[in-house]
Design a protein with these regions (language model features):
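C-terminal output helix
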Residues: 107-117
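Two-component/phosphorelay signaling modules centered on CheY-like receiver
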Residues: 14-32
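Short amphipathic alpha-helix used as the core "switch/output" element in two-component signaling
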Residues: 42, 64-75
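Receiver (REC) domain active-site loop signature in two-component systems and cognate sites
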Residues: 58
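Acidic catalytic/metal-coordinating carboxylates
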Residues: 35-39, 62-65
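Active-site beta3 strand of CheY-like receiver
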Residues: 47-53
């Protein structure tokens, strides 16, 4: 069995973020939480994670901008957008930056765990192919 994924939650809603952190910690997932895009980018410069749970609508730097800068910095984490709503233009834009999944808030813990597991498996498979010299 593979190791449990590491997850970064980027969400400006303190209560929602705290609940998610607790729900994932109970399942033995290494989880980190930050409240803004700037903190997320700083965190990702110093720490690798498998999955980023990213809110799109945040004050200051939007989730779209966070995602764009993550990719520019070379972050290879799988990204799951967690948001109350996303407009079509925004959805197209985030897909261009490699969003792997999308969940509406509030989300069911089991569904979130399933999505995190799938994202972790995709990342592990992708990294395994690179290690073996395949693309």
């Amino acid at each position: 069995m593979s190791k449990m994924p590491s997850v970064l939650i980027v969400d400006d809603e303190d209560g929602f973020r705290s609940i998610l952190v607790r729900r994932l910690q109970i399942r033995d997932i290494q989880v980190f939480g930050v409240s803004c895009g700037e903190d997320a980018l700083e965190f990702l410069q110093n720490q690798n994670v498998d999955v980023v749970l990213l809110d799109i609508k945040m004050p200051g730097m939007s989730g779209v901008e966070v995602l764009r800068q993550m990719r520019e910095q070379g972050c290879k984490a799988e990204v799951i957008v967690l948001s109350g709503h996303v407009l079509l233009d925004t959805a197209v834009e985030i897909m261009d930056f490699g969003v792997n999944d999308y969940l509406l808030k509030p989300c069911d813990t089991e569904e979130l765990m399933d999505r995190i597991t799938l994202a972790h498996e995709r990342k592990t498979e992708r990294e395994g192919k690179k290690v073996n010299g395949k693309k």
